[in-house]
Amino acid sequence: MLKRKKIKPITLGDVTIIDDGKLRKAITAASLGNAMEWFDFGVYGFVAYALGKVFFPGADPSVQMIAALATFSVPFLIRPLGGLFFGMLGDKYGRQKILAITIVIMSISTFCIGLIPSYATIGIWAPILLLLCKMAQGFSVGGEYTGASIFVAEYSPDRKRGFMGSWLDFGSIAGFVLGAGVVVLISTIVGEENFLEWGWRIPFFIALPLGIIGLYLRHALEETPAFQQHVDKLEQGDREGLQDGPKVSFKEIATKHWRSLLSCIGLVIATNVTYYMLLTYMPSYLSHNLHYSEDHGVLIIIAIMIGMLFVQPVMGLLSDRFGRRPFVIMGSIALFALAIPAFILINSNVIGLIFAGLLMLAVILNCFTGVMASTLPAMFPTHIRYSALAAAFNISVLIAGLTPTLAAWLVESSQDLMMPAYYLMVIAVIGLITGISMKETANRPLKGATPAASDIQEAKEILGEHYDNIEQKIDDIDQEIAELQVKRSRLVQQHPRIDE
């Protein structure tokens, strides 16, 4: 007979009360690192035309644009390796230490892009050095977003995880706005000729002081409550093992959590393809294909992104009330239905209609980004959360990162300006399947962690809800038993009379 593990009833002392001050510091530090990651993406996306001329001067404009965007996409090949590396270390040594390392690598590699001489100076080594810097970024970013989202999720109260997690992608959008704004400002001040000569380097130099600030904030943070609980549960022998070797079983991840892996991959693909299409490819699309000036296209995207900043936390707040799944499903349906109308407006050559088309895509994107950072960490238990999420996330981003290059190639090869819309419709189907099949995670404790609350009163309410849920399950079981008793009685009455 199997021995069942004795289960202790949960008490008020088992509920983790989250310190507001520590929570604010965690969100600030995590969001700043994410902002710096997307600052680079924003800068790179908006100076792609300049980089094409600096590093690929012999090609025609279309090839220059595709080559520059390809350099943006290639580092995504290295991100899964970074995700696996930092994911294992994050589950082994903790989240805080890894986030300090990733921001250092990211800021230094971004800064170094600004130091690379042009093709005219060092020839083929210029694009090679650019690619190496981008690959270093890709390696560090492989552990950045997943680590930051886990850090915020493990610090957040269960009832506010959606709202708190939404600030992570608020940082992404803010970083993008800052990067794009810096490009426009410098380009306007120094003029296009000077910008191509040396002005494009300045935005990359800004990454270093941002990285120093981020490192200071992250270094001062404490480890997350959920990971600390995991360590505290280990016996001394296991504690030593945690320091000496990884406790991550990729067999367990692949066999026991494959549904969560697929849900994670689907959600990240839907979110990031839309993200890169709108925020990285659209500036090039507007300038190269629709012949708007670079500054004009950038200003439209910046205005859209500023609007997204206000919508982002609202989506997170609403997801705490209505759940994460409705937003994924609603966003996917809207993306499928509105992709073609949005691009018809974008191709109208009327500034107001262009803005309306981009705004439609932006609101749809907010449906995904508002819930992603709170949804993904809740799919996996504490002891494998970083490794599993980093692996799934970066495999997905590997696909999504090809979006700018693939979209540019599709438009150039087909001469059909609606190709990006068709691409988004395919992605919308993936998002819809994911939203329908994924489990709801809102207002529930993270797997492998005790409930988390903002204060004692909320902790008592959580215990009350837990009690009511158990009572409801008991009632359901009693009902099932009663129905089985009725079925049993009917079967007994149907016994054939073999003694007559």
UniProtKB/Swiss-Prot annotation:
Pfam families: Osmo_CC, Sugar_tr. Keywords: Cell inner membrane, Cell membrane, Coiled coil, Membrane, Symport, Transmembrane, Transmembrane helix, Transport. The chain crosses the membrane at residues 38-58, 66-86, 98-118, 122-142, 170-190, 195-215, 261-281, 298-318, 326-346, 351-371, 391-411, 417-437. GO terms for molecular function: symporter activity. InterPro entries: H+-coupled_symporters, MFS_dom, MFS_sugar_transport-like, MFS_trans_sf, MHS_symport, Osmo_CC, ProP_C, Sugar_transporter_CS. Residues 59-65, 119-121, 191-194, 282-297, 347-350, 412-416 are periplasmic. PROSITE patterns: MFS (PS50850), SUGAR_TRANSPORT_1 (PS00216). Belongs to the major facilitator superfamily. Metabolite:H+ Symporter (MHS) family (TC 2.A.1.6) family. Proton symporter that senses osmotic shifts and responds by importing osmolytes such as proline, glycine betaine, stachydrine, pipecolic acid, ectoine and taurine. It is both an osmosensor and an osmoregulator which is available to participate early in the bacterial osmoregulatory response. This is Proline/betaine transporter. It comes from Salmonella typhimurium (strain LT2 / SGSC1412 / ATCC 700720).
